[in-house]
Regions:
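Serine/threonine-rich, repeat-prone extracellular segments and beta-strand-based repeat modules
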Residues: 1-12, 28-29, 51-85, 91, ...
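Extracellular interdomain linker/stem segments of modular secreted and single-pass surface proteins
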Residues: 12-18, 93-99, 173-175
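Solvent-exposed, low-complexity, repeat-rich "mucin-like" stalks and linkers
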Residues: 16-52, 97-131
Length: 175
């Protein structure tokens, strides 16, 4: 003989969402221009009207595309029962701001029809966070390639992540 027992269970309504907080920041907070935000390591904790808190997933982040020069924070949004709460995470987007000739080329005087010689020239890239990087002579371009009379400078150009920086180098072109 089998007996079955039934018990009434009353299920209360889930408590309302009160707030969210980023309780552990993401592993990465510094990005290159056009990189995407990486959530790895980030923990988002929601607090509810009953005073309880729990780590949640299913949150969204904005911007959710490639990071730009003006992005300084990521907004995290979490919605439950039609209530949305947000929190922000500071980030840094590093991008190329300029280039400088930190050591001039060995040769600055040419004859018409000569090509510019990069020998001895050191070009340094400068970034939005004041970091610098010495460029190899294959990283940048020099225009024009062939030097003509009355030219007084050449243009040095370097492009990184869609940002181009230029500077000039004085030259003297003889007959």
């Amino acid at each position: 003989m089998t007996a079955k027992t039934y018990q009434d269970i009353t299920v209360g309504e889930a408590p309302d969402l009160v707030s969210i907080a980023i309780t552990n920041p993401p592993d990465k907070t510094v990005y290159k221009l056009n990189e995407y935000f990486d959530r790895t390591g980030m923990l988002v904790t929601a607090t509810f009207a009953d005073g309880k808190s729990r780590i949640v997933s299913g949150y969204s982040v904005s911007p959710n595309g490639a990071l730009g020069k003006t992005d300084t924070t990521i907004t995290v949004s979490y919605t439950r029962k039609g209530i949305t709460k947000t929190a922000t995470q500071a980030i840094t987007v590093v991008y190329l701001t300029s280039i400088v000739i930190s050591n001039p080329p060995t040769y600055t005087e040419y004859y018409e029809g000569n090509s510019f010689n990069k020998a001895g020239m050191v070009v340094t890239a400068i970034y939005s966070n004041d970091a610098t990087k010495i460029l190899s002579d294959t990283d940048y371009t020099v225009t024009p390639e062939i030097l003509m009379m009355k030219m007084t400078s050449v243009t040095i150009s370097y492009t990184e992540n869609g940002v181009t920086a230029t500077t000039t180098q004085a030259v003297k072109v003889n007959y």
